[in-house]
């Protein structure tokens, strides 16, 4: 496919992925200030906290306080994640303040799945009916199934597209057997193995099997190919991406400490702007949010546009200079 989408949907995941990855304490006020700044950028979906055990993820101990403290912008979906039934119950109590997305995560690698959940991929899929039932009780008769390590794994090597399709087929069969359905597919390059050709191969293979199911990509910039992979995905017609302001985040189970986190929101918005793809996001406001994110965490973050700036600013200066001359 040579044509790229006219518009794309971007979910901002920086606060959730970024805060949980930080070792130093971050104040509730600083967390809220970043979410509020993101709310003013035009992004339509912000994943900003997790309902998880504070014992294991202390940065997420203030999930309820964050939800109570943020200033909601019209038209913005505020989202969270959960890893177990207790987390979902906490989220469900606040569904007037949250957009609940019925999600179920698996992986293309048994080793990575075990490090994440202490279960094999097949054991994890056996848990899907229980999740489907919980979501159905909340009036959500579908699941979005995300495949972590969909392109490669630091423990097992390359992950072939047929492996990902097999995992998704098993998940779909379990969902349909209990009256649910596959609502969306997420493909995550959790450890930064993907290259543009792999993106096209996997997206093409998945779309051949599920031509009418939305596909979302969650890409990490571990080996500096995330933006190139976004271009490849756009060329395949993918129109939904997870991104993180200033490149916040990472994966604690990926076996490479200090590696770059998620693909940077402002870099992707800039890419789309230059390619004529509409995101609905104010790039200058997102650059400001990226600079704020860096101040909040107290150390440099990998996003490029924080220092490089928006080309439209330079174009405007150049036009003004020509007029003056």
Q: Over which residues does each language-model region extend?
A:
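Catalytic cores and adjacent flexible loops of soluble metabolic enzymes
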Residues: 1-325
């Amino acid at each position: 496919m040579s044509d790229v989408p006219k518009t794309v949907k971007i979910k901002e995941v920086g606060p959730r992925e970024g805060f949980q990855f930080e070792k130093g304490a971050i104040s509730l006020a600083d967390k809220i200030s970043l979410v509020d700044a993101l709310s003013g950028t035009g992004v339509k979906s912000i994943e900003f906290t997790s309902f998880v055990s504070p014992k294991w993820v202390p940065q997420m101990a203030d999930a309820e306080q964050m939800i109570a403290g943020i200033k909601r912008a019209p038209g913005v979906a505020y989202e969270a994640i959960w890893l177990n039934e207790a987390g979902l119950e906490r989220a469900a109590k606040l569904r007037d303040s949250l957009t609940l997305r019925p999600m179920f995560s698996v992986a293309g690698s048994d080793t990575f799945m075990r490090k994440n959940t202490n279960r094999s991929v097949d054991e994890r899929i056996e848990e899907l009916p229980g999740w489907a039932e919980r979501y159905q009780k909340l009036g959500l008769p579908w699941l979005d199934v995300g495949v972590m390590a969909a392109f490669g794994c630091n423990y097992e090597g390359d992950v072939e597209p047929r492996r990902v399709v097999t995992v998704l087929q098993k998940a779909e069969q379990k969902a349909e057997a209990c009256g649910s359905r596959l609502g969306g597919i997420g493909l995550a390059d959790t450890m930064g193995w993907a290259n543009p050709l792999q993106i096209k191969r996997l997206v093409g293979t998945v779309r051949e099997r599920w031509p009418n199911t939305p596909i979302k990509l969650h890409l990490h910039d571990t080996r500096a190919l995330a933006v190139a992979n976004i271009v490849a995905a756009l060329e395949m017609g993918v129109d939904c991406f997870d991104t993180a302001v200033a490149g916040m985040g990472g994966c604690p189970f990926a076996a490479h400490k200090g590696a770059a986190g998620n693909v940077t929101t402002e870099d992707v918005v800039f890419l789309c702007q230059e390619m004529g793809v509409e995101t609905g996001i104010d790039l200058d406001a997102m650059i400001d949010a990226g600079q704020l994110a860096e101040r909040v965490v107290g150390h440099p973050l990998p996003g490029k546009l924080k220092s490089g700036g928006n080309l439209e600013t330079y174009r405007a200066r150049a036009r003004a200079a020509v007029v003056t001359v």
